[in-house]
Amino acid sequence: FLPAIVGAAGKFLPKIFCAISKKC
């Protein structure tokens, strides 16, 4: 269960960080 959450966060968080910092 946890690895799935970590995997999803690993894909999702970079997109959020990219959008906030605008460093894509």
From Swiss-Prot:
Expressed in which tissues: Expressed by the skin glands.
Gene Ontology cellular component terms for the protein in this record: extracellular region
Disulfide bonds: 18-24
Record Pfam families: Antimicrobial_1
Family of this protein: Belongs to the frog skin active peptide (FSAP) family. Brevinin subfamily.
Function (record text): Antibacterial activity against Gram-negative bacterium E.coli.
Protein name per its UniProtKB record: Brevinin-1Sb
Organism: Lithobates sphenocephalus
